[in-house]
């Protein structure tokens, strides 16, 4: 399908070619649904400025509301899990050690599964699709590995309170929310960072991956100074505030699991990226966040990442420069930066050409085939993501999953997608079976009869291949395996 270069007035969707609106929706959402391929004139504006109501169907709302992570605060959950760990440790070396560890591991696994379920249900059914795509993008940008320590007890809250609310807001607020979240602090070992025993791990990743990027002009001395600024920022899983002396008691901060312990902080003055920062405690961290979020290098690096995710693997210097300028003029307003991206000819020309990573492939396939039915079991999707090498919340290193086609277009990946396409196209009844449930579902829709298929400009070779399928399930599989469906 040849995509024309779009006029700059991209927001006037009525002026686009008939097929461009579905392509736009396909790029900025987790995929079109079978009978919802079109886009209204105001759709993009609504996506850039969504309201609080995600418009989830009642069945999805009920599933999310029933989760422990939706009913209990993270602090209560994480402290309870920590107690299970302490009980398991107390039994170490005894005959009951193995059994004593099971409740701890089961609790962590269940909490991770709950977080994954809530995230996928929103991806599948929220009307605010751009926000949900950005929630995945920003989680990947500020990545934490769920299976490290007690992070499985925190990862749902990390996505829900640190990432999602700021996905289309100011970058400074997003950065701050991640800096002060216990999941990030524990993941990058900042609870081990103390005056006289500096741990540079988190400071280095903030500068290298979260803000300025490698080779952007900061020095090793800047990393060391930021590490000093971050001393004392930690996590308290006991539920009991620390005892500190009266002379520093006012400096101590305890907020849920977050803790700033002045006894561990380096109160010496610092020079960070050319800025003098007076030793003052937690305020130093806020000052550093202000400095980092307003660096031209941060604007350029993060704009490049956004362009790679939403446009193309190698965005032009001109596009990145335009986005960077908007960033600096708007003080890091993410929606404004995205507006500049979406209004560009380069973005319009890229529609339909961006290769889907595993998350986009799996979620878009389920949305297309079952977009009008609320699934009862997300485990099959999680299994598919694992098989394709992109488990949800499962990237071990802080760099996050790659965003480029080369990482995901290998022959092994494509073969796995064919197998998954066969399962989804044949009905995937396991999606609609909760634990212990034997209910069956009607067969999937015949995709070739949907509005989506009718609007799709498939090459003749692809249409001919699809018609070779002997059954609707076979034809669904062939569509979901087609080169066109592999792209967005």
What are these regions (language model features)?
Residues 7-15:
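Bacterial N-terminal signal peptides
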Residues 18-20:
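Boundary at the C-terminal end of the N-terminal hydrophobic targeting segment
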Residues 34-141, 145-156, 162-164:
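N-terminal accessory alpha/beta regions
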Residues 1-5:
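Positively charged n-region of N-terminal signal peptides that target proteins for export
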Residues 127, 131, 145-149, 185, ...:
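Amphipathic alpha-helical interaction segments
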Residues 115, 151-372:
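Active-site substrate-binding loop specific to GH73 endo-beta-N-acetylglucosaminidase modules
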Residues 22-37, 45-48, 65-68, 295, ...:
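Flexible, low-complexity segments enriched for small/polar residues
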Residues 28-31, 122-123, 141, 145, ...:
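Alpha-helix C-capping/helix-to-loop hinge sites
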């Amino acid at each position: 399908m040849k995509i024309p270069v779009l006029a700059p007035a991209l927001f006037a969707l009525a002026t686009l070619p008939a097929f461009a609106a579905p392509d736009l929706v396909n790029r900025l959402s987790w995929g079109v649904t079978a009978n919802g391929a079109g886009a209204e004139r105001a759709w993009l504006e609504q996506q850039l400025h969504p309201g609080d109501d995600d418009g989830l169907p009642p069945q999805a709302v009920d599933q999310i509301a029933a989760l422990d992570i939706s009913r209990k605060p993270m602090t209560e959950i994480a402290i309870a899990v920590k107690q299970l760990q302490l009980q398991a440790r107390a039994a170490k070396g005894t005959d009951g050690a193995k059994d004593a560890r099971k409740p701890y591991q089961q609790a962590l696994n269940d909490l991770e599964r709950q977080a994954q379920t809530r995230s996928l249900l929103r991806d599948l059914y929220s009307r605010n699709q751009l926000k949900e795509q950005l929630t995945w993008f920003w989680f990947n940008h500020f990545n934490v590995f769920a299976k490290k320590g007690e992070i499985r007890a925190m990862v749902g809250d990390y996505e829900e309170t640190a990432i999602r609310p700021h996905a289309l807001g100011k970058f400074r607020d997003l950065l701050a929310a991640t800096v002060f979240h216990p999941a990030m602090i524990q993941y990058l070992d900042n609870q081990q960072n103390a005056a006289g025993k500096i741990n540079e791990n988190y400071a280095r990743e903030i500068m290298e991956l979260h803000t300025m990027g490698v080779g952007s002009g900061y020095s090793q001395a800047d990393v060391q100074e930021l590490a000093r600024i971050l001393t004392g920022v930690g996590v308290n899983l006991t539920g009991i505030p620390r005892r500190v002396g009266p002379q520093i008691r006012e400096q101590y901060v305890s907020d849920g699991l977050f803790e700033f312990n002045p006894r561990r902080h380096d109160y010496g003055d610092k020079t960070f990226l050319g800025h003098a920062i007076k030793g003052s405690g937690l305020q130093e961290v806020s000052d550093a966040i202000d400095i980092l979020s307003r660096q031209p290098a941060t604007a350029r690096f993060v704009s490049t990442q956004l362009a790679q995710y939403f446009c193309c693997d190698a965005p032009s210097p001109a596009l990145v420069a335009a986005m960077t300028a908007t960033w600096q003029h708007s003080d890091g307003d993410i929606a404004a930066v995205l507006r500049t991206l979406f209004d560009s000819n380069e973005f319009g020309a890229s529609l339909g050409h961006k290769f889907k990573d595993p998350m986009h492939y799996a979620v878009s396939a389920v949305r297309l085939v079952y977009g009008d039915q609320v699934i009862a079991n997300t485990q099959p999707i999680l299994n598919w993501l694992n098989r394709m090498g992109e488990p949800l919340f499962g990237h071990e290193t802080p760099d996050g999953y790659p965003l480029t086609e080369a990482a995901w277009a290998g022959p092994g990946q494509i073969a796995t997608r064919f197998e998954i396409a066969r399962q989804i196209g044949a009905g995937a009844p396991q999606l609609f079976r909760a634990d212990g449930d034997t209910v069956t579902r009607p067969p999937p829709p015949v995709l070739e009869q949907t509005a989506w298929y009718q609007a799709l400009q498939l090459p003749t070779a692809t249409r001919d291949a699809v018609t070779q399928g002997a059954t609707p399930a076979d034809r669904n599989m062939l569509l979901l395996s087609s080169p066109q469906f592999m792209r967005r």
